């Protein structure tokens, strides 16, 4: 075992050769490097698989032995200061390494097909390899300086991938926005690290926790300054994990390729903030005010993310706000001291959200040949609908991910979210009400995404102009009787998974639809069939095998990963696998907790949380399921139309919520008017002062000297006698001035 830990330092460096070789190859041998591009993909997956196997082996040892291993090397600067760097292996490191590698491998496999037609294919894989290296280095770091170094590398890789298509102004602006927002958090983190070193004199985690606790117990440090340093440490995770108010970069980060959106939201960028708070929790837990701030920021983010997701039209931005809300749950759990629940939800959410993002990428790929390659169209849920029969495997995978995120048993997120809701009830009734209400909102907006995407008809072909020039939007007809389509009778799961890419002429197949009378007069996007007056529509086709395979693996994770936190004791809920994994941390955070909970209490709490989720799903079905239009003609619903006053108030409330959500809570607008515009005005004034005043003085002296020289040259006429005359004149004037001042004194 000791032999295994001695080589743990190599974990971050195993995936590193690929980005280095790709960078050198593209600079020195671009043609040969591009011709071997599939080899680089295979090598990336192979090296990351080695790290995954190594991490699993370390995790098994952690479960049975529950030990912590640290190895450091000292780099002496002088007699007073020496910097130590090394690696730190504990349960948190092991489980984060497994999470990063498993999701990373699946995203790499997915990206091979998704990015196959992109000119930046190799650049993308170089960034991805460096991204995985940076994140693995972060989770294995033994001190705060190493953490900060890899923290910045993780941020740099995320900026490169968010702005991967940098020729698009929107992507470039999103990259800049992510960079500037995270600069605020990273600067706070740096100040917190320096302040903590000034107090304790150490960067090492174990020494830091011990010294910090002794200072608190013996009252040998200013508590206010200590709280300030701890808060500055927390500012970094606020920005990195998209917590309020530094969350504004996350929705715009969806301008990057979809595979990197899956990796950022599941296992790298946003998970880094949760990891750091979990790593520093023994430090935060001795300061109650900081714990309350962490939980408060978490609960605000939970509610804000859920409300902002309610009216999003972009499928990826809807999932992004969902990530923001779920990260708020994790931060809330950490603020309450529920270390196990937070990390459990981090694990379950990672696989569920990776599945949803990869599913959305499959949907976007299917829509691009119909609506074009503009993200405003291919990612717009309003133009989707009716994809169930066209992409059945993607639909099933997306549905499982949606149900998991809604908290439906026995899927993964049910077990972890239920624990957080129960802990919030013990922590604060107000926080519990908000957390439970948001669980219902989560079910609502997730099924809204699902229903708009897969149910009804393909809305691209049912787009109808409202008929009013002043209309601010196009009205959509979601209904229309569908008649028989030409389908491939041999279509099935096994042939789909075994076919080659060469067996498919394109990603899409041609299908002819007959339109019923109730939509006959609407305006359609049509393709003329070789001059014939026949309307032929192109419909999405299921994605290729290399896109579907990672999704199917993530489906298995979503179905079964919750088992690591499910208790199996017949008498009560005893410590499960995950609890054994985090035994040292549980003893630290819950010293007086009982080792089991009654099954009756568990079932009662689970029934309550599932009921909330089903209520949210029911509301979503009522509002977005296609058969809702027929219900409007029922007498029961028509009777509500008579209550005009109440209906008007209800519509005002709905419009307010819609505008709030669609405009991102007006937070971006507030930052733009109050902060960005002020900084721009200050920058313009500074530029004016620098160019007109500072440069004006300098340039004025130079220009004056130039003209004096020119005048002197003109008067002198290049004769020595003239120069002597001018020189004597200056001396005489100087003596007269001196003589005048001399007699003034007397």
From Swiss-Prot:
Keywords (A to Z) from UniProt: Chloroplast, Membrane, NAD, NADP, Plastid, Plastoquinone, Quinone, Thylakoid, Translocase, Transmembrane, Transmembrane helix, Transport
Main location per the UniProt record: plastid
EC number(s) per entry: 7.1.1.-
Catalytic reaction annotation: a plastoquinone + NADH + (n+1) H(+)(in) = a plastoquinol + NAD(+) + n H(+)(out); a plastoquinone + NADPH + (n+1) H(+)(in) = a plastoquinol + NADP(+) + n H(+)(out)
DNA damage among keywords: no
Topology term for the membrane: Multi-pass membrane protein
CC annotations in GO: chloroplast; chloroplast thylakoid membrane
One GO term (biological process): ATP synthesis coupled electron transport
GO molecular function terms noted in the UniProt entry: NADH dehydrogenase (ubiquinone) activity; quinone binding
A Pfam short name: Proton_antipo_N
Compartments (UniProt record): Plastid, Chloroplast thylakoid membrane
Name of the top EC class for this enzyme: translocase
Lineage top rank: taxon: Eukaryota
The UniProt record lists the keyword Secreted: no
Transmembrane segments: 9-29, 40-60, 89-109, 125-145, 147-167, 185-205, 221-241, 258-278, 280-300, 327-347, 354-374, 396-416, 425-445, 547-567, 608-628, 723-743
InterPro entries (UniProt xref): NADH_UbQ_OxRdtase_chlpt_su5_C, NADHpl_OxRdtase_5_subgr, ND/Mrp_TM, NU5C-like, Proton_antipo_N
Protein family (similarity comment): Belongs to the complex I subunit 5 family.
Subunit structure comment from the entry: NDH is composed of at least 16 different subunits, 5 of which are encoded in the nucleus.
Function: NDH shuttles electrons from NAD(P)H:plastoquinone, via FMN and iron-sulfur (Fe-S) centers, to quinones in the photosynthetic chain and possibly in a chloroplast respiratory chain. The immediate electron acceptor for the enzyme in this species is believed to be plastoquinone. Couples the redox reaction to proton translocation, and thus conserves the redox energy in a proton gradient.
Alphabetical list of PANTHER family matching this protein: NADH-UBIQUINONE OXIDOREDUCTASE CHAIN 5
Name under which the protein is recorded: NAD(P)H-quinone oxidoreductase subunit 5, chloroplastic
Species, as recorded: Arabidopsis thaliana
């Amino acid at each position: 075992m000791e032999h295994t830990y001695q080589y743990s330092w190599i974990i971050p460096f195993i995936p590193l050769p690929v980005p280095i070789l790709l960078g050198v190859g593209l600079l020195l041998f671009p043609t040969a490097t591009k011709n071997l591009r599939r080899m680089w993909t295979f090598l990336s997956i192979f090296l990351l698989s080695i790290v995954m196997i190594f991490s699993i082996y370390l995790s098994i040892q952690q479960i049975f032995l529950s030990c912590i291993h640290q190895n450091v090397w000292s780099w002496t600067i002088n007699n007073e200061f020496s910097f130590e760097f090394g690696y730190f292996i504990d349960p948190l490191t092991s489980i984060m390494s497994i999470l990063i590698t498993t999701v990373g491998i699946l995203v790499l496999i997915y990206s091979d097909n998704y990015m196959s037609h992109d000119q930046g294919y190799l650049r993308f894989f170089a960034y991805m390899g460096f991204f995985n290296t940076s994140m693995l280095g972060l989770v294995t770091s033994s001190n705060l300086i190493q953490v900060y170094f890899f923290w910045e590398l993780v941020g740099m890789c995320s900026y490169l991938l968010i702005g991967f298509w940098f020729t698009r102004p929107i992507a470039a602006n999103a990259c800049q926005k992510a960079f500037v927002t995270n600069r605020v958090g990273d600067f706070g983190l740096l100040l917190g690290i320096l302040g903590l070193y000034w107090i304790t004199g150490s960067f090492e985690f174990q020494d830091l926790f011990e010294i910090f606790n002794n200072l608190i117990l013996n009252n040998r440090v200013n508590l206010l300054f200590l709280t300030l340093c701890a808060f500055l440490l927390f500012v970094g995770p606020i920005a990195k994990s998209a917590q309020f108010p530094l969350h504004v970069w996350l929705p715009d980060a969806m301008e990057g390729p979809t595979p990197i959106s899956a990796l950022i939201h599941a296992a790298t960028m946003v998970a880094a903030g949760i990891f750091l708070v979990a790593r520093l929790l023994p430090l935060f837990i001795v300061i109650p005010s900081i714990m309350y701030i962490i939980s408060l920021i978490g609960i605000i983010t939970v509610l804000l993310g859920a409300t902002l997701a309610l009216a999003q039209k972009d499928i990826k931005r809807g999932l992004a706000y969902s990530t923001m809300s779920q990260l708020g749950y994790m931060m809330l759990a950490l603020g309450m001291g529920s270390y196990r629940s937070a990390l459990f939800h981090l694990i379950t959410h990672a696989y569920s959200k990776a599945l949803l993002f990869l599913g959305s990428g499959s949907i976007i790929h299917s829509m691009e040949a119909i609506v074009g390659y503009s993200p405003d169209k291919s990612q717009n849920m309003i133009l989707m609908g009716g994809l169930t029969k066209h992409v059945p495997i993607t639909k099933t995978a997306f549905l499982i991910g949606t149900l998991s995120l809604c908290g439906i048993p026995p899927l993964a997120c049910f077990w972890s979210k239920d624990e957080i809701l129960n802990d919030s009830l013990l922590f604060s009734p107000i926080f519990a009400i908000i957390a439970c209400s948001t669980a219902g909102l989560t079910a609502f907006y997730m099924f809204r995404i699902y229903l708009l995407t897969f149910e009804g008809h393909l809305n691209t072909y049912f787009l109808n102009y409202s008929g009013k020039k002043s209309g601010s939007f196009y009205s959509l007809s979601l209904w229309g009787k569908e008649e028989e389509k030409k389908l491939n009778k041999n279509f099935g799961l096994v042939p789909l998974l075994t076919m080659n890419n060469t067996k498919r002429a394109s990603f899409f197949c041609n299908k002819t639809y007959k339109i019923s009378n109730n939509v006959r007069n609407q305006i359609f996007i049509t393709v003329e069939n070789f001059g014939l007056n026949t309307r032929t529509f192109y419909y999405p086709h299921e994605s290729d095998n290399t896109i579907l395979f990672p999704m199917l693996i993530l489906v298995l994770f979503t179905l079964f990963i919750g088992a690591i936190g499910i208790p199996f004791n017949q008498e009560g809920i005893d410590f499960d696998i995950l609890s054994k994994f985090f035994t040292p941390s549980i003893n630290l955070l819950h010293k007086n907790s009982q080792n089991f909970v009654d099954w009756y209490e568990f079932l009662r709490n689970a029934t309550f949380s599932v009921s909330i989720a089903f209520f949210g799903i029911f509301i979503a079905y009522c509002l977005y399921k296609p058969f809702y239009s027929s219900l409007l003609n029922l007498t029961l619903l028509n009777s509500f139309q008579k209550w005009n006053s109440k209906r008007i108030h209800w519509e005002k409330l709905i419009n307010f919520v819609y505008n709030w959500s669609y405009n991102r809570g007006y937070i971006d607008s507030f930052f733009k008017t109050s902060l960005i515009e002020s900084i721009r005005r200050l920058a313009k004034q500074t530029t004016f002062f620098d160019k007109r005043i500072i440069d004006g003085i300098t340039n004025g002296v130079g220009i004056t000297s130039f003209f004096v020289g020119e005048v002197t040259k003109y008067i002198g006429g290049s004769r020595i006698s003239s120069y002597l005359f001018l020189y004597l004149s200056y001396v005489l004037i100087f003596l007269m001035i001196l003589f005048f001042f001399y007699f003034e004194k007397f």
